């Protein structure tokens, strides 16, 4: 039996998700940041920021050659090149804790791991499940599509 309150629950869940992600979709192209914004990018552990979003982070947002993890200027590196998804998970968890400790900052997560590292949004987005309810983390549309 199909009950109308099931329809309402489905609608409310969708509406809640829409409210949750409102204003929290990372722009597909970022060439400038507000003072409190941080560009979150996929890196390698060696911190060789030579291509993709890592190169943008180095050239424009303060990423430091030789530093593959964490806050650097107005950027935050999450290593994605060292192996499978499970090797990325602890760095994403560390990032989420950092973001939680810094509510004054707004983190713009790029589609980390989905460029040079070769993963799909379906692989990486679930790692950001806990970020869904954090108002100071924006996620790429492709990640929202997976975790909503």
What are these regions (language model features)?
Residues 9-148:
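Macrodomain-like recognition of ADP-ribose-binding/processing modules
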Residues 5-7:
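Acidic, Ala/Val/Gly-enriched low-complexity intrinsically disordered segments
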